[in-house]
Amino acid sequence: MLYLLSELSGVFSPFNVFRYITFRTGGALFTAGLFVFWFGPWIISLLRLRQGKGQPIREDGPQTHLLTKRGTPTMGGLMILAGLLVAVFLWANPRNSYVWITVVVTLGFGAIGFYDDYLKVTKQSHKGFSGKFRLGLEALIAVAACVAVAEYSAPGLAYRLAFPVFKDAIVNLGLFWIFFASFVIVGAGNAVNITDGLDGLAIVPVMIAAATFGIIAYLVGNVIYASYLQVNYVPGTGELAVVCGALIGAGLGFLWFNAPPAQIFMGDTGSLALGGLLGTVAVATKHEIVLAVVGGLFVLEIASVIIQVASFKLTGKRVFRMAPIHHHFEQKGWKEPQVVIRFWIIAVVLALLGLATLKLR
């Protein structure tokens, strides 16, 4: 809402600062972080009181988890989403369609995750509601979002898929783009969800990816930078940098409480929502394939589960000691902090590689 003050810059010139995306991105980051840090203890206490035993811990998982994680409350995604939304509503341009599309996807996926968490906590079971039904709801939200993105895209840009590195490799997928882009959003949501299995493991790579796509959104939303980098200019997407800034701030605030030993888990409420947000930003900025690079850690995590399940069904043998792959390394003897920090390093390297694709043409 503060963006609207820029329209009064003729009356009070300092208000002109609210026109700048970089300024508002910083403001969103600070606001979201402060909100989560300030209200975090109260939210954690409330969730612990309401949940009692907290998130159920897998009996077949690493035995140390039964001792260190039992009784920890979940649904911490609520504090992330609250901080993110406050910052977005305060600092983003309320007239920007891409912002609203991203917010709707984030809230929709968050609501699905919340209901799943609720069932798990109340039943003290790892099974939420039907996986097929859950995927169906996610797909419905994603398709609606992609149709909206196509509707608000510049003429001739709606259904185009650009390949990184190759500047002339642009394919018009037609209406098939809707299904491809929806797959990206749903896949991103579930990949982050799968990754969220250790203290701090998911939130830091999410922030790294958000920082990367905040930069991408800013560049492709600026006609001068987009022309220089020879990437698709997508008017209006620069505003998504503010959303990414809010996510980083909320993530930093959450990490304060999620650092090992975690006081709270984000749960499906957070992981589905944040993954959906990243997927939507990638779709809106026309960098869907780059998300697979920047979010390569998430791809690795969900791929390990798919490979494990497929291998066991086809051959009766498991490829990994345990899936997702972060548990495989735990079973091999890596300590939890080793797994987490090494995966963070991978996320940083992949983010830099993703950014490099902007210049390598």
Curated annotation (Swiss-Prot):
Which reaction equations make up its catalytic activity?
UDP-N-acetyl-alpha-D-muramoyl-L-alanyl-gamma-D-glutamyl-meso-2,6-diaminopimeloyl-D-alanyl-D-alanine + di-trans,octa-cis-undecaprenyl phosphate = di-trans,octa-cis-undecaprenyl diphospho-N-acetyl-alpha-D-muramoyl-L-alanyl-D-glutamyl-meso-2,6-diaminopimeloyl-D-alanyl-D-alanine + UMP
Cofactors required: Mg(2+)
Which keywords are on file for this protein?
Answer: Cell cycle, Cell division, Cell inner membrane, Cell membrane, Cell shape, Cell wall biogenesis/degradation, Magnesium, Membrane, Metal-binding, Peptidoglycan synthesis, Transferase, Transmembrane, Transmembrane helix
One MF annotation (Gene Ontology) recorded for this entry: UDP-N-acetylmuramoyl-L-alanyl-D-glutamyl-meso-2,6-diaminopimelyl-D-alanyl-D-alanine:undecaprenyl-phosphate transferase activity
Protein origin, superkingdom: Bacteria
Q: Sorted alphabetically, which CDD domains does this protein's record hold?
A: GT_MraY (cd06852)
* Family, as annotated: Belongs to the glycosyltransferase 4 family. MraY subfamily.
Q: Which InterPro entries match?
A: Glycosyl_transferase_4, PNAcMuramoyl-5peptid_Trfase, PNAcMuramoyl-5peptid_Trfase_CS
> What EC number(s) are associated with this protein in UniProt?
2.7.8.13
Q: What is this protein called?
A: Phospho-N-acetylmuramoyl-pentapeptide-transferase
**Its pathway?**
Cell wall biogenesis; peptidoglycan biosynthesis
